[in-house]
């Protein structure tokens, strides 16, 4: 059976009090609507239509070709929003799910189960519900004497008795697609808001003797809608807790989960230890037996088995097996560290390739460079790579030793087994097996201060 999805993402989000389009506010480093799209796609849906309004181009820019789009010029209610997908879906057969773009915690597993429940029951519609202690603001699930759905009533249209009901509609539905678009044309806006409500489609189906199911989830967090910054922070916390829980169950030690942020796309191997205050974002992959020291930040990087990152920042970089970084080092985009490399305190590496066993232990800048195997770069060494207009490359061969306080003025090549004396400013290439000294000779005047 074909499956389709409609993501409702046209709301202005005035309660966010933001210039940013509501569904583009981020949870765990990713726009809310992108979380929703990934869960929808993961549930086995064949085609997705996202309903957009003001800020449509921004949403399209994030979701790209993963979705089709329909524009809702006026926000006249959820049924009206769904009807905007008519040109894409009206003639389709199968099941269509409707999901709100501000529910970033919904999982593909719950959507899969909702669809399966709906199709197994041969229902025309199924609503995802949950029981919560404080149902204010949600539509209530009103059941009849036999316990089946009678109707869904919105908060502003509910009687006091209905407001006392704690089973709520999540705003997530599964429909027989043909039935959905037939009934949408019959929805009226005679309610307190003057809007066209999608839950009224369920009442129309019931009035015609159709089957409407309720599938209740036990995970209330999943259906949390985000309407303001307070709810955004709650969703962030819930996502963080869920992600950290997943990694811990898969063999990762997270010493203080409450202070540790790990993005949803991060991969971490077993027996890795994450210390307090760490942030790991983007498409980062961390191997086994790694230690990520407290207050480190890692973005879109690869850390191989046995490496150790201590109180450092790693952006768009790769760190080889058993390599030590930090404390207080910065790996900028393009930094590539081989195995058994050491990058020590107050070292900055940018667009540089440090081969296996290379060492840059303290107070150095290595940019646009290649450092050979087992080469030692002394304290205070600077690759002088920029002339004000262009960047130039520094190459240092293997098994070389660069003394302290050396300037390597690019473009320059230092060969293998070279010794560069401390305090030198190197402007010319140095061949293999050489000693390079480029500094003024010391003059000592005895008794000068007497």
From Swiss-Prot:
Catalyzes the last two sequential reactions in the de novo biosynthetic pathway for UDP-N-acetylglucosamine (UDP-GlcNAc). The C-terminal domain catalyzes the transfer of acetyl group from acetyl coenzyme A to glucosamine-1-phosphate (GlcN-1-P) to produce N-acetylglucosamine-1-phosphate (GlcNAc-1-P), which is converted into UDP-GlcNAc by the transfer of uridine 5-monophosphate (from uridine 5-triphosphate), a reaction catalyzed by the N-terminal domain. The active site is at residue 362. It is found in: Cytoplasm. UDP-N-acetyl-alpha-D-glucosamine binds at residues 8-11, 22, 72, 77-78, 139, 154, 227, 332, 350, 365, 376. InterPro entries: Bifunctional_GlmU, GlmU-like, GlmU_C_LbH, Hexapep, Hexapep_transf_CS, NTP_transferase_dom, Nucleotide-diphossugar_trans, Trimer_LpxA-like_sf. In the N-terminal section; belongs to the N-acetylglucosamine-1-phosphate uridyltransferase family. In the C-terminal section; belongs to the transferase hexapeptide repeat family. Residues 230-250 are annotated as: Linker. Its cofactor is Mg(2+). Pathway: Nucleotide-sugar biosynthesis; UDP-N-acetyl-alpha-D-glucosamine biosynthesis; N-acetyl-alpha-D-glucosamine 1-phosphate from alpha-D-glucosamine 6-phosphate (route II): step 2/2; Nucleotide-sugar biosynthesis; UDP-N-acetyl-alpha-D-glucosamine biosynthesis; UDP-N-acetyl-alpha-D-glucosamine from N-acetyl-alpha-D-glucosamine 1-phosphate: step 1/1; Bacterial outer membrane biogenesis; LPS lipid A biosynthesis. Homotrimer. It is an enzyme of class 2 (transferase). This is Bifunctional protein GlmU. The keyword Magnesium applies.
């Amino acid at each position: 059976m074909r499956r389709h999805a409609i993501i409702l993402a046209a709301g202005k989000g005035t309660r966010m009090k933001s210039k940013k389009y509501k569904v583009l506010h981020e949870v765990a480093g990713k726009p809310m609507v992108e979380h929703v799209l990934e869960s929808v796609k993961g549930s086995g849906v064949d085609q997705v239509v996202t309903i957009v309004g003001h800020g449509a181009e921004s949403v399209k820019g994030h979701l790209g070709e993963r979705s089709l789009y329909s524009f809702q010029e006026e926000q006249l209610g959820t049924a009206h929003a769904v009807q905007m997908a008519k040109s894409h879906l009206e003639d389709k057969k199968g099941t269509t799910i409707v999901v709100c773009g501000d529910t970033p915690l919904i999982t593909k597993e719950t959507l899969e189960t909702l669809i399966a429940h709906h199709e197994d029951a041969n229902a025309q519609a199924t609503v995802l519900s949950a029981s919560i202690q404080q149902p204010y603001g949600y539509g209530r699930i009103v059941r009849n004497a036999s316990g089946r759905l009678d109707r869904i009533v919105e908060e502003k249209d509910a009687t006091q008795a209905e407001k006392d009901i704690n089973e709520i509609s999540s705003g997530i539905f599964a429909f027989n697609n043909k039935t959905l678009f037939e009934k949408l044309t019959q929805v009226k806006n005679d309610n307190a808001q003057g809007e066209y409500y999608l839950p009224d489609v369920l009442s129309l189906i019931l009035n015609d003797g159709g089957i409407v199911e309720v599938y209740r989830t036990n995970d209330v967090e999943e259906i949390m809608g985000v309407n303001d910054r307070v709810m955004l922070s709650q969703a962030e916390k819930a996502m963080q807790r869920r992600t950290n829980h997943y990694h811990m169950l898969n063999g990762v030690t997270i010493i203080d989960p409450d202070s540790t942020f790990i993005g949803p796309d991060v991969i971490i191997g077993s027996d890795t230890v994450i210390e307090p205050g760490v942030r790991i974002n983007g498409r980062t992959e961390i191997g086994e037996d790694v230690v990520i020291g407290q207050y480190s930040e890692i973005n879109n990087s690869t850390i191989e088995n046995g490496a150790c990152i201590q109180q450092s920042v790693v952006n768009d970089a790769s760190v080889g097996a058993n390599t030590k970084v930090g404390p207080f080092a910065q790996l900028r985009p393009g930094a590539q560290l081989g195995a058994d490399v050491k990058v020590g305190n107050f070292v900055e590496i940018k667009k540089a390739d440090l081969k296996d066993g290379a060492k840059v232990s303290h107070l150095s800048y290595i940019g646009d460079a290649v450092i050979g195997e087992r080469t030692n770069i002394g304290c205070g060494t600077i690759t002088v790579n920029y002339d004000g207009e262009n960047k130039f490359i520094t190459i240092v061969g293997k098994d070389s030793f660069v003394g302290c306080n050396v300037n390597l003025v690019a473009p320059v090549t230092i060969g293998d087994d070279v010794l560069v004396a401390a305090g030198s400013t190197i402007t010319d290439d140095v061949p293999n097996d050489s000693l390079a000294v480029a500094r003024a000779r010391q003059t000592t005047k005895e008794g000068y201060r007497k």
